[in-house]
Every structure is written in structure tokens, then in C-alpha cells.
């Protein structure tokens, strides 16, 4: 449970809000469909990376070196992981929080950064146990509030769910603007300028949906393997059983983040 909450703490968050908003702005409603599609592929990637991480006793940098036999690839991954954590893992979240507090509470971004640095240091210096405990406390509360706020917005605004789903599917495959209709009037138009705009819209939906989906659930990046690597089983058989169990939990995390949360 601690490792699952820690992994959800890394996936559920800013990517579900700013990531989805950016995907919709770039690719339209069809981007949501491709975020879901990327999540289904990401389930297999999440299971595989977590399984290998526990089997080899570490993250991708370990099984790249010991499993694949490439020490260079493992070191390259470790370097890229550090660089990725600075942007995707820290700057986006800290920047979003700083902007929110600046407008809501007139707190300068520097003050937000100092507070975040102190709180993060307190948690990190406590080791893996404190990280897991903090995640197990914060994740259920934050995820519950997020889903409650999103659900209340949908129901209070009387959003027509069937029409929204029709627009999502229609936008994903480059249908006309009336993709939410079901009378057969939504057809593909590949003639002249309209066809070019349709193809461009579909490409933008796929590109933004897949990229923002990976940004949100982190499936395939290897970070899930690092977090789940804290779970170990004694003996080769127990280790394989633990790897399979944690791999299934990784699938649940992707479903919760990308399918439910987004």
C-alpha cells in the first residue's frame, strides 16, 4: 500500500489538470481519447518495468546493466532521469502551485519555493519510510478531493455526457465538428482544405493526447519501477510473486490516473 500510494503521489497531480488542459488546447476533445488509448498501452509498460525492477532489485538503471548487459545504457538512463525530474518532476508542479498561490493568496513565488523546499527536505531526509507514510496520508485525501471537485463540476453544470463522449471520439478520428451527432451526418472529409484540416486535427489530437498521457501516468518512463522497487520478496519464488503483484498494482495506478483522473 505504501509503494502504491507513493507511486500515485508521483502520477496523480498537476499532469491531470494542466496536462489535460494543454492536450485539449492543442488537440481538441479528441486528445482525451488518445490519452485513454496511451493508457491501455501504458498498462503493459507499467507492468513490465515494475516486474523487472523487483526481479533485478532496482530501477531501470539496474536491470539495464544486469539484465540487458549495458552499463552505458544504465548510466545514460540515470542521467536522463535526473534531468527529467528537474522539469517534468519538479518545475511544473512547483510553478503551478506558485501561480495558484500568487493569485489566490498574494504569496510571492519565492515564498512558495522556500516553503516547498523545506517541506520536501523534511520528508526526504526521513528516508523511504517517511516518504511512504506521507504519501499514504496525502494521496487518498488529495485524490478524493480532486475527484469530488471534478464530479461536482460535471453534475452542477449539467454536462451532457453522451454528447461529450461523441465529441471525444469524433475529434480523435478527425470527424466533422458535429461529431457528437448520431444521425450519420458526421463523416470523414478528405477533400481539399477540409481534408487537410481534418488530418491536421487528428494528428494534433494523437500527438498531444499521447504525450500528455505519458506526462500524467509516467508509464514507460521507469519511475514506477524505482518506487515499487522498495517491495521485495525473500527467495526467488517469493520475489517473482511479489514482482507480479506489484506489476498488477502498477496497472491499477495507470487506470486510476489516466482513465479515472483524466
What residue ranges belong to the model's regions?
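Hydrophobic alpha-helical transmembrane segments of multi-pass small-molecule transporters/permeases
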Residues: 3-10, 35-39, 51, 75-87, ...
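Membrane-interface "cap" regions at the ends of multi-pass membrane proteins
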Residues: 1-17, 234, 238-240
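Inter-helical loop and helix-membrane interface segments of multi-pass membrane transporters/permeases
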Residues: 25-26, 51-115, 163-203
